[in-house]
Amino acid sequence: MDSATVYVGIDVAKEQLVVAVHPTQMCWETTNEQKAFPSLARRLLALRPTGIIVEATGRYHQPLARALAKAGLSVCIVNPRQVRQFAGAAGRLAKTDAIDAHVLARYGQALQPQPRGVRDAEAQQIQDLVARRRQLVRMRVAESNRLDGVSSVVAASGRRIIRTLDHEITSLDTAIDRALSAERWRDTAAIVASVPGIGPQSTRSLLTELPELGTLNAKEVAALVGVAPLNNDSGRFRGRRTTWGGRRDVRSTLYMATLSAVRYNPPIRAFYQHLVDAGKPKRVALIASLRKLVVLLNALVHQHRTWTLEVPRAA
């Protein structure tokens, strides 16, 4: 079969996979378990597909994606919202597992997304630790907010919960730092941490949730984070450019880092102040500074060098 024309879409559920092939309209089901992956990989390899398109489904797609990528197949993890928008534009309003699989295959054929998004088991474990830490921090904030105006008995209970959460957060920090001390992450961690404004938690988050850092150009990394300005023009109308999409957790991490960078990182501080002096709203200046910060980080990692006052050229 001509590999230039073949795309495979896989709809993933907890226990089941539905596989569709474009343009042959072939479709079949299999189980979503490790023992089924080798035979599925062999069947797909025989088709010589250009790409395997899988929606991000939390956890259920990850073992499948790793197994297929390890078998030598080109796997792309895609955003479910973008796929549903594509389905609507194509007039596919009905939704079944088989329809979803065919939509994924057609999405691949129409847009030809680049293979990206498959983490190995070790990287996924660290990312899970970072995500868990974020959950516990949010729980701690929620518990702290409940302490105001309650009885002493309830407040004491809340403080015990907070102490437990503090202990768990510290344990997670230790586990994450131990994992990131491995050789594959050590150099990148040192580069990221060298930038003024980037603290330990920002370093952990960027290494695990933005693994593409250093492999993309400036526009691509800004778009991946969701800080690439998008035009809003029509005819003679020229609308205000806005940012949209991207990885929310990474963007939140970088937002907090930028608040620090506009105070302690001289190039970022000068850039931010220049925009404010030019009349830009402070929030607009802050988002622009965030974009400059992530482009700077990307360039440093690409060039394998730590931060200095000399601003590196964007990758």
Which residue ranges define each predicted feature?
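A detector of single, family-specific signature residues
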Residues: M1-A315
